[in-house]
Amino acid sequence: MRRLSWLAALIVLFSAACKNSGTMTQHHAFRLKPGEDLKLAIDSFVKEKQIRAGWISTCVGSLTDYQIRFANQEKGYSDKGHFEIVSLVGTVSINGSHLHISISDSTGKTMGGHLLEGCKIYTTAEIVITSSDTFEFLRAKDGSTPWNELQVQPRK
């Protein structure tokens, strides 16, 4: 019983600290249906909700087709079949997103890389995005790599 009281007190204190920190977060949950394109649907949702600084909190679901790009490769790799979404992580913004996906096949073989257009939902994709009203995520070249990298700015 003491453990539960201690845990409840900790949760209340943490909630109060977050509330007083000036950081406001929102949680957005949505479901994709069979045949929808995972990346296009996420990009569309981010645009519709005008999310300027967000991240994927969780995603579970499955795909029939996938299109991913492995590290340091110019072209994507694709395949058809039935695949579980093991993980989907990354940052999202109306200014550009950066998402990585891991999928597994029917034997449990798992692979992952940059999420590209062409990942079609098999049964479902249940997605939660958390966003911050405090920051804005931008993408720009910074000289350290040839790619547009994340720039975190205070929200105006």
What residue spans do the PLM features occupy?
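Bacterial Sec-dependent signal peptides at the C-terminal "C-region" and cleavage site
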Residues: A8-M24
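N-terminal intrinsically disordered, cationic/polar leader segments
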Residues: K19-A53, S57-H98, D105-K156
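Hydrophobic alpha-helical context, especially transmembrane and signal-peptide helices
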Residues: W6-A8, L99
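Positively charged n-region of N-terminal signal peptides that target proteins for export
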Residues: M1-L4
